[in-house]
Amino acid sequence: MKKPQEMQTMRRKVISDNKPTQEAAKSASNTLSGLNDISTKLDDAQAASELIAQTVEEKSNEIIGAIDNVESAVSDTSAGSELIAETVEIGNNINKEIGESLGSKLDKLTSLLEQKIQTAGIQQTGTSLATVESAIPVKVVEDDTAESVGPLLPAPEAVNNDPDADFFPTPQPVEPKQESPEEKQKKEAFNLKLSQALDKLTKTVDFGFKKSISITDKISSMLFKYTVSAAIEAAKMTAMILAVVVGIDLLMIHFKYWSDKFSKAWDLFSTDFTKFSSETGTWGPLLQSIFDSIDKIKQLWEAGDWGGLTVAIVEGLGKVLFNLGELIQLGMAKLSAAILRVIPGMKDTADEVEGRALENFQNSTGASLNKEDQEKVANYQDKRMNGDLGPIAEGLDKISNWKTRASNWIRGVDNKEALTTDEERAAEEEKLKQLSPEERKNALMKANEARAAMIRFEKYADSADMSKDSTVKSVEAAYEDLKKRMDDPDLNNSPAVKKELAARFSKIDATYQELKKNQPNAKPETSAKSPEAKQVQVIEKNKAQQAPVQQASPSINNTNNVIKKNTVVHNMTPVTSTTAPGVFDATGVN
């Protein structure tokens, strides 16, 4: 008998020997459960594949059915088109037969009319017979044979000849053919079938058209995920965006164009006042008042004279508004004249309205007019001189003269009536009437332009800054232009006007000499105010702003180098990304 100690040792041995078997069984059990999971997943995948296949099959059947419907609709449409073509062909044949029949009838009628005209005799009159009988001296013996033979002859048959019976025969009436019930029934059945076929054709075409549109939308939605209507809306939106972009571009182009024009006018005003006046035309007085106000405000701002700055702003605004009001009145007069010219018989009235407005505008502002406007003013003055204006025009002319006088008195400008007498103006009119129309018009135009040039120069000289070399040259050129106008020989035909201009020029000459006397040492403008110098200043300013950034960059590079050279090592705990028990628990015993 074994001892208990030996039995305990044997029990341990049995347990130790059974451990591989238990581990194998456990491993087999785990493997089996894994296989079961895989089998379940495969079953699910197979079921999903079958479901997908079934869905694909159903959708394929639906697509095939839709294609069959389309084919049937197309075939019905083709059949309907063929039926329509046959019907049209039958109608064309019938129309052709009718045309041929009408043509043959017309040919026959034409030939009969030609024969009738050719065989028709000329109607004889009794004039020749009466002449012959009167010329015969012997009386003709009449024969009574016809009277004796007449009763012996049989009576003639009555003949009712219609003159049109030979080529317009009366058609014989044809009795209508009686149709049998069978033929009538067949005809009605044919008509019924024809109407049913046409009705079916109409419905087929309508259905096919609607079906084609729906199929087109479906195809476009399948291919492009977009319908035709949505594409049209997108095209509209694109067109709207394009229109907005084009509009913005046009606005930018117009803004640049007018900005360049304004800059060019500013440069001309500072360097060549005579050319500035001729190029700006009716806009010259308004631009001159704007530029004068800006220069004066700029000078007072730099000097720090705030009281003078306020006065300059108010005066400049008043001048600008005055010139703008005169320009608006001229524009309204031109618009009224254009409307009157459209009305028949109102051309002369339109010329009077526009000529009066141009004359008042030039006398008030001193604007330089173009050749066409100068001729309109001269023609109006010529009509007024000859007394060709109506009573209404004369009344309006008096009102305009009163307005111009009041405006000149408020602004301290001399009126042309105050510099000459009525007798001198009357004598001048008589002298001008003796000239030819062309010479009279030329004299009036030269006088108007010379007076306007003097008004412009007076305004320019009052605000000219003689400390600038460019302004001094511009004033001298404008003064020389006035002297040339005064020496124009055409002004000799207008002695009163020449006296008026001489009085104005004497004041201008005194003002000019005063400007030359008090003129400071004119110096050319510094190069710092030129566009190139301003551009250089902007570039230098940008470089100065970028310099601190460029100086700070080396320190940043050094810091990066220090960071990159750091070799400190940190001991980190090992970490895994799996769900295993870990490195330290992996050596444990069950």
Curated annotation (Swiss-Prot):
Biased composition (Basic and acidic residues): 176-185
Chief place where the protein resides: virion
Keyword check for Metal-binding: no
Subcellular location: Virion
Region annotated Disordered, chain positions: 1-35, 147-185, 515-535
Example GO BP: viral tail assembly
One GO cellular component, as annotated: virion component
Record function comment: Serves as a base for tail tube protein polymerization and acts as a template for tail length determination.
Entry protein name: Tape measure protein
Species of the source: Enterobacteria phage T4
